[in-house]
Amino acid sequence: MAGIRPRYLVFILSILMMISGIALAWGAQNNLGTVQATEITLTTSGGVPISGILQRPLAATPATPLPGVVVIHGVIQSKEWVMAFGIELARRGFVVLTIDAVGHGNSGPSVGSNTDQGGIAALDYLNGLAYVSTLGMVGHSMGAGIAIQTLNETSTPVDSLVLVGGGSSNMATWANASVPRNIFVVVGLYDELFDVPELLNSLATPFNTTTPVIPGQLYGNFATGTARMVILPPTNHLFETIDPTCISATTEWLMTSLKGTPDAYWIPSTLLLYPMWVAGGLISCLGAVLSTLALFTILIQFKPFRRIQHSPNSRYFAKTPLYLAMGLLYGVLGLLALFAMLLVNLPFTYPQSLGLPVVLGLFLGGLVAFLLLICIKFFLQRKEDPPSWNDLGGFNGLKNGGIKSLIMTLSIGFLLGLIGIIWLYLWVIPVDLYLALDFRVFLPFLKALSPLRALFVPLYFFLLLPVTLIDGLWIMGYLRTKPQEKWWYTQTWWTSKAIFIKVLIMAFILFIQTVMSFIIGGPFISGFMGFYLLFLWIFIPMYAVSTTYLAWSYRLSNRFYIAVFFNAFLFSWLMAAILPIYL
């Protein structure tokens, strides 16, 4: 009994972590009860459903209307990615509608030549609310472009426009010194998609000046609606939506342009609550990971799961020079294959933008890595005691009942992996339905799926399954390090070393990009290559999580099949959730 008590204790503690993280995030999104967040569905003129979160301060009534703001996210994102704007604006007396653009999040897919990407429908909805007075718009990246398109196609008056990391490089083609009203441009100093000197030059005409625009200087005035300003906070494209300077400056601008002066609801812009929302997501996601690890540990004690429970094999381990050299090679191969597929124009289309290039890149990298592993095995056969497939966490031959044993092991691994995914989804759905909250806030992990998006999961699963299997053979097979004296120290050592070697190349690239950008005062690698590097910020935490599952699966069963199936489901869920859909 004493042997299983820690498993249940960790399981209970992880559930408490999830509950506390959800409570923190909900408290921030609802400003501790003074704001009501509601999930709503709109419809564009083309009949596409738009998913949104409406945050209404309880003080907003027909008798005391408050300004309304539409907030729109960037590409390969969803409304949660810009929720920090909604949180800080709503608690300061703004009615905020944050939407999933067409083809993104839980909104309907982009079909044909749809002109309304959700902005017009959202603006019309807010304009029709009796407790909303004036209107403003905030758009990040692609969302900035949608906001501009919306203003060009609607007659609804908008008194303030905030463009974050997008829409401003060609402003002279759609704006002048007075139209649109009160424009605020926010571009990260290290934004990979902008050349700052070129941007400041291009803003001269709409800012009504003949010289390059000076960051932080107010041009025009709010009384006539001609106010313009640009700021360059020290951040990159991806993190503009959670950068404190971006958030604070945006709230200040909208307060001045839509309210005129601070009112009874105003809170100093430096007093930010959204970090509590981010912390809640981190805590709940960490609890989710721990809960599945504990769940696997509990379930494997029972029939029929315990048939695959075995102590880990310690006969083979990779020495440090081999671990580093081959680990780096494995990481480089994977990255080269991924970026090669991203940069190549495929001769056919796929409904989820970038889905096929990413999956094929991962598959190609896995295939090359597997062929390399076979070559290494063949070379090592000449040595005295080469590692067997069994030593690497694979299977011990197909003779003498080997096929039956392999099928049984794979079946149980699949079932446990599926149970783990179902367990997580059973947490995600009620949080989304009853709290109007995304379980993982803005993190690229554990997002509720629309029925259409759910259809993509099995398609990705079968393509990613060989990738996660090969990853197991490398990370917890060929590159598995020497065990230590105590099991918990060994597990910690295995997990940390596995994560280190898995993300080393990606972390190094991001480190160089960050440091060099800081040194030169702008993005070191810019353009689309710089944009694609932002994907590494998604892959690193996901690989850290998947590698943790690999190490624990090996601990439980001397195999990594539980994690192979679970990780294939997990990455399929991730891709189905975040990639745009264009039909």
PLM region spans:
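Alpha-helical transmembrane segments of integral membrane proteins
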Residues: 325-583
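Alpha-helical transmembrane segments
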Residues: 16-20, 286-293, 469, 543
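Alpha-helical transmembrane segments of multi-pass membrane proteins
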Residues: 21-25, 293-297, 334-341
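Soluble extramembrane regions of membrane proteins in the secretory/endomembrane system
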Residues: 32-272
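Cytosolic-side membrane-insertion boundary helix
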Residues: 262-292, 300-324
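Hydrophobic H-region at the start of alpha-helical membrane spans
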Residues: 8-17, 284-288, 364-365
